């Protein structure tokens, strides 16, 4: 069987090489690049992201990343957002009182977590959606690695989307599966066997 081709979008943010290695370990042929043609034609596109929402959006715009994501989604070609790469898929992010427009694939805002200790950093369980493809075969007590201060804490998008939640004092979205567009707030590339299983499930679905 021919390996599935995956591009990890290089727009100046994210754990690019660790994502590349994690995807290679589950059998994908992976390229880290900002090249539009490569990003458009790959079987799957991974949009990583760490740091500030506004900085990630600025980097994405420099390489026409918004258009790449939008055209892939419109064509039904799979996209996976990770951490801030998930957050920027929403309508906006609010950091330090400043609202930054996101890619707008999902309505709603990404806002700061309300908890005694910020960021939420470490391992946590999730409540995966019934019928989830990403979490297929995983135990209910599987743990995933998070490091973030902001999250989407409500869902205003399609009622058909599969929503996976986690709790850090209050619930927040840990993953979304919405047609060709999927995303995780946790880092699958840092989440050991459980994260590898999520990536493997995603690659298998390409």
Curated annotation (Swiss-Prot):
It is found in: Cytoplasm. One of its GO terms (molecular function) is lyase activity. Keywords: Amino-acid biosynthesis, Cytoplasm, Glutamine amidotransferase, Histidine biosynthesis, Hydrolase, Lyase. GO terms for cellular component: cytoplasm. InterPro entries: Class_I_gatase-like, GATASE, Imidazole-glycPsynth_HisH. The active site is at residues 83, 187, 189. The keyword Chaperone does not apply. GO terms for biological process: L-histidine biosynthetic process. Its EC number is 4.3.2.10, 3.5.1.2. Gene3D superfamilies: 3.40.50.880. It catalyses: 5-[(5-phospho-1-deoxy-D-ribulos-1-ylimino)methylamino]-1-(5-phospho-beta-D-ribosyl)imidazole-4-carboxamide + L-glutamine = D-erythro-1-(imidazol-4-yl)glycerol 3-phosphate + 5-amino-1-(5-phospho-beta-D-ribosyl)imidazole-4-carboxamide + L-glutamate + H(+); L-glutamine + H2O = L-glutamate + NH4(+). Induction: Down-regulated in response to the thiol oxidant diamide. The keyword Amino-acid biosynthesis applies. Residues 5-206 form the Glutamine amidotransferase type-1 domain. It holds the Pfam family GATase. PROSITE patterns: GATASE_TYPE_1. Pathway: Amino-acid biosynthesis; L-histidine biosynthesis; L-histidine from 5-phospho-alpha-D-ribose 1-diphosphate: step 5/9. HAMAP family: HisH. NCBIfam families: IMP_synth_hisH (TIGR01855). Heterodimer of HisH and HisF. IGPS catalyzes the conversion of PRFAR and glutamine to IGP, AICAR and glutamate. The HisH subunit catalyzes the hydrolysis of glutamine to glutamate and ammonia as part of the synthesis of IGP and AICAR. The resulting ammonia molecule is channeled to the active site of HisF. This is Imidazole glycerol phosphate synthase subunit HisH. The gene is hisH.
């Amino acid at each position: 069987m021919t390996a599935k081709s995956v591009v990890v979008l290089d727009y100046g943010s994210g754990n690019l090489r660790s994502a590349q290695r994690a995807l290679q370990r589950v059998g994908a042929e992976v390229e880290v690049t900002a090249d539009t043609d490569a990003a458009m034609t790959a079987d799957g596109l991974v949009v990583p992201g760490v740091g500030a929402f506004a900085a990630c959006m600025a980097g994405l715009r420099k390489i026409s990343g918004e258009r790449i994501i939008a055209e892939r989604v419109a064509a039904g070609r799979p996209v996976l957002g990770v951490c801030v790469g998930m957050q920027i898929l929403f309508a906006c992010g609010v950091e330090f009182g400043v609202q930054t427009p996101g890619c707008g694939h999902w309505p709603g805002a990404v806002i700061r977590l309300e908890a005694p200790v910020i960021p939420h950093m470490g391992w946590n369980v999730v409540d995966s959606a019934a019928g989830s493809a990403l979490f297929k075969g995983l135990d209910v007590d599987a743990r995933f690695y998070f490091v973030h201060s902001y999250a989407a804490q409500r869902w205003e998008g399609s009622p058909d989307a599969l929503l996976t939640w986690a709790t850090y004092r209050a619930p927040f979205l840990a993953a979304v599966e919405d047609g060709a567009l999927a995303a995780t707030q946790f880092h699958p590339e840092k989440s050991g066997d459980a994260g590898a299983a999520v990536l493997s499930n995603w690659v298998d679905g390409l």
